[in-house]
Amino acid sequence: MNALLTNPFKERLRKGEVQIGLWLSSTTAYMAEIAATSGYDWLLIDGEHAPNTIQDLYHQLQAVAPYASHPVIRPVEGSKPLIKQVLDIGAQTLLIPMVDTADQARQVVSATRYPPYGERGVGASVARAARWGRIENYMAQVNDSLCLLVQVESKTALDNLDEILDVEGIDGVFIGPADLSASLGYPDNAGHQEVQRIIETSIRRIRAAGKAAGFLAVAPDMAQQCLAWGTNFVAVGVDTMLYSDALDQRLAMFKSGKNGPRVKGSY
């Protein structure tokens, strides 16, 4: 296989190795490159809740390419045209949000594969993914290098988790704590005892099925707990939240009445 098509992130997931990541919501190549120099195993470039265009995603992929941190792209949704664009700009690993059923999971898998194995549109000669046609036999090799992760973040998805885990081509399942807690009736309270119990059970089910389990936890104790439950790819922070907290902390050093950083959000 061409060296440009190797996917060390996927290979480490196959081996069950733990990989620590960072969420990127700042939408700039400059910030993405700074994060890539820090040494995280993977970087999630967010196109769901961060206002990233395809061109923004493209520039961030370029910015992190020289470094060891592996980029994971989360598009706003899992439609076939959007997945095609994200793969063509060079993403090797995708995290697809809001996958509730096995049928949805199969559709996402199909969107990432060229015919006859799927429905990905053919355009390698004009795509960064194939280095504009310079990677020989790209279509024959690329499937093995793609890593497909799906998000389970609703009660419906939990009810269908075993069927989703049975779908061939799904490499890992990521638990979305914020949406999941809201769907379970505990909005903005992913730390609720019942939500935590369900998260633990789900992680163990995912690993028992031979898939990788993922999570985003901005609180260090929650990240450690997820690792203890068996999660093997964990994002331990969000760049915009870390930046915001650092600003608050620095200001609190010089202005009275400031209480310092707070953990913001549902993660």
From Swiss-Prot:
A Pfam family hit: HpcH_HpaI
Summarize the subunit comment: Homohexamer.
Q: Which cofactor does it need?
A: Mg(2+)
* Top EC class for this record: lyase
Which InterPro entries does the record associate with it? Aldolase/citrate-lyase_domain (IPR005000), HpcH-HpaI_aldolase (IPR050251), KDR_aldolase (IPR023593), Pyrv/PenolPyrv_kinase-like_dom (IPR015813), Pyrv_kinase-like_dom_sf (IPR040442)
Q: What is this protein called?
A: 2-keto-3-deoxy-L-rhamnonate aldolase
Span of the signal peptide: none
UniProt-annotated catalytic positions: 49
